[in-house]
Amino acid sequence: MVTRMTETPEKLLSDPREGPDRHERDDSADLARNTISLPSSLAGSSTLDRLVETARNYARAAASDSTLKAYAKDWAHFARWCRLRGADPLPASPQLIGLYIADLAAPSGKAPALSVPSIERRLSGLTWGYAQRGDRLDRKDRHIASVLAGIRRKHGRPPAQKEAILPEDLLDMLATLPHDLRGLRDRAILLIGFAGGLRRSEIVGIDHRKDDTPDSGGWVEIMEDGALITLRGKTGWREVEIARGSSDQTCPVHALSQWLHYAKIDFGPLFVAVSRNGLKATSERLSDKHVARLIKQTVENAGLRPELSKADRQRLFSGHSLRAGLASSAEVDERYV
C-alpha cells in the first residue's frame, strides 16, 4: 500500500519567493569529480593520486555528456517537486517516488502527462542521482513497481512499427542522391547501415581507426574481401562483417571507400558534415538525427508507398527502417541482427 502524503497548499506551487534549494543545482560535473577518491589512510600517494584522475575519467565515460545532463535535469525536477510539497528528496523513499511517478502520469495542474517511456527515463535519472549521492533507489520496491505497472497498463501504448526498407527500396532511394560530396557520404551511410543492420547512433559513432576520438563508438577496417566494423555496445564490443557487393553501385565497401577518398578522411569520425559550399568535409561528427532525416527525405524523393500521405510516410520510415530491412531480407529475428 502506498503511503499517503499531505500535499502543500496550491498557492505554494506557484510562489515565486520559494527559490531553488541545494538539491536542485545541476551539479553533474561536481558529482563526476567527487565520485572517485582515495581513502583517507592512503592520502598523499602521488602514484595513487594519478590513478584517481584516471579512474574519474573512466567514470565520466560511463555515460555520454547528453545522458548525464538529462539525468541531472531529472534530479533537479524531482528535487523541485519535493520542495513544493514540503518533502525532502534524501534519503531515497520508494513511497515518495511512487507518488512522484503517479503525478507525472496524471498531473493535477497544467503540466502535460508524461508518456511511459519518459517516466521510465525519469526513474533512470533518479537512480543515477541517488547513486551519485551515495544512496540507492530500489526500483523493484512495491511502492514503485506496482505504481509503474499500473501506469504501463493504463497509459502504455504499443510501439509504432517502423516500415522495413527492402533492397529494391534502397536502390530507389540511392538513385535520388546527388553526385557530389554529400551524395557520396549519404550513399555510404545508407549502404553501410543497411548491410550491417546498424542503429543510427552506431553509424555516426564509427571512427576511421581505433581510439581516434574520446567519444568513439567503434572503428572500421577495410580489407580486400570486405569491411570489419567493431562497435561498442551496452554489453561490450561486437564485430560486424560487411561483404563487398556484386557491383560498385550497390557495394557498401566501395561506397565507403569512395567517401573516404574524396572527403580526404584518414582520422577521426567516419561520417562528418560537409562545408556549406559542398566542396570539403569538416571534422564535425554527424548527429544520429541526420540518418533519420536522410531516410525520410530519400523515401519521400523515391516515392515509396505512394498510397500513403506524406505524414504517414514520415511516421512509418525512420532510422530503424534500415535495421528492420536487413532483418526482413535475411528472414531473421531483428534481435539477432
Language model: regions and residue ranges:
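Extended, non-catalytic subsegments within catalytic or DNA/protein-binding/adaptor domains
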Residues: 1-336
